[in-house]
Regions:
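FIC/Doc superfamily catalytic core
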Residues: 1-357
Length: 357
């Protein structure tokens, strides 16, 4: 039953995303949410607001830039992976290319981005050594053989209806984490690999599943289930956990898709009733791409003057669409609360023990 429930939920999500007009306006938020939660599993401490503020160019010193860059790099890796699937199958070459994007700057950029490891690594709490590690991935020769076998499994089972896609995803994720082929970034790559498999297969036309929400909420169990697979071969328990995560997050993402569509229709109606111009309608749509803005961004985004941008901001404030959040008299920053709040649900905060880097 867990498989049937997860498959049905995923189908609903794909259908819900297909029914959203101009779905490309909203994909960035789904991608950023997955990037944020996947990075938080590894200990990154920032929020969706921090990401969009950084991308706006208005980042402050209150949040370490290295944490924000880690998520921004994940977004770049995510987008790169989905784009490259059009021309390259999932395999060693694509994984290395995506990894190079993931660790292109900041934390981990000194850990051989884009290269499989040439030395032994291990999994354990911060400060652990090879002698005290909770798990030691295969040495280099065996690692290469295991990667070859994993790639063969991905390709051979793609056309085999006897093994359901979601079971394949769960098996591939756990095996990739066990192989741990990179010096850093394995956890994030393993979770991204699930989305890549779903999109490559056509089960998801758009990358709108944020599985890391579930994995973050159940982080200790997530790590424990993976450990049980490695140590005791507890594959069935792992797959049951994994499928429950697919079902829960797919249903949540479907609800969010419906809420996004309803919000857009409601706000467009409100702006039209208030006599909004075509440029203001254009700005409203752009806010789904960048929900934290300033006057300078608006001027550039819809090619208007500074006075016009200020007038649009006042109108959107009056309609309860934009809210000033900087508290400054100059260089003010505005937040699209109703949209961000659909995705910016509270989480348990940064990690503090074992990581799957």
């Amino acid at each position: 039953m867990p498989l049937a429930t997860a498959a049905e939920a995923l189908g609903r999500l794909d259908g819900a995303a297909a029914r959203i007009p101009d779905v490309d306006l909203f994909l960035g938020m789904y991608v950023r949410r997955e990037a944020l939660l996947s990075s938080q599993i590894e200990g990154t401490d920032c929020t969706l607001d921090d990401i969009f503020t950084f991308e706006l160019g208005a980042h402050t010193a209150e949040v370490p830039e290295i944490d924000v860059k880690e998520v921004v790099n994940y977004v770049a890796a995510f987008n790169y992976a989905i784009h490259r699937l059009d021309s390259l199958p999932i395999g060693g070459r694509l994984l290395r290319e995506v990894h190079a994007q993931l660790l292109r700057s900041g934390r981990g950029s000194d850990k051989s981005p884009g290269e499989f490891r040439h030395s032994q690594n291990w999994i354990g709490p911060p400060g652990s050594t090879l002698a005290t590690a909770s798990f030691i991935p295969p040495p280099i020769k065996e690692m290469g053989d295991a990667l070859t076998a994993l790639e063969r499994f991905i390709h051979q089972t793609a056309e085999d209806d006897r093994l359901h896609l979601l079971i394949r995803c769960g098996l591939v994720h756990a095996q990739f984490e066990t192989i741990h082929p990179f010096l850093d970034g394995n956890g994030r790559m393993g979770r991204l690999l699930v989305t890549m498999l779903l999109c490559e297969s056509g089960a998801l036309a758009q990358p709108v599943l944020y599985l890391s929400t579930y994995l973050h909420q159940h982080r200790d169990e997530y790590f424990a289930r993976l450990t049980a697979v490695r140590v005791d071969g507890e594959w069935e328990d792992w797959l049951e956990f994994f499928l429950a995560g697919i079902a829960e997050t797919a249903l949540d993402a479907s609800r969010t898709a419906h809420q996004v569509h309803a919000l857009r229709e409601d706000l467009r109606g409100s702006l039209q009733e208030a006599g909004g111009s075509a440029r203001e309608m254009q700005l409203l749509d752009r806010l789904y791409l960048q929900p934290i803005v300033n006057s300078k961004w608006i001027e550039s985004a819809i090619s208007v003057s500074q006075p016009a941008a200020s007038g649009f901001i006042r109108r959107l404030e009056q309609l309860d669409i934009l809210h000033e959040i900087s508290g400054r008299a100059r260089g003010r920053v505005y937040r699209f609360n109703k949209y961000l709040d659909l995705f910016d649900r509270p989480t348990s905060g940064p990690a503090d023990d074992t990581t799957l880097s």
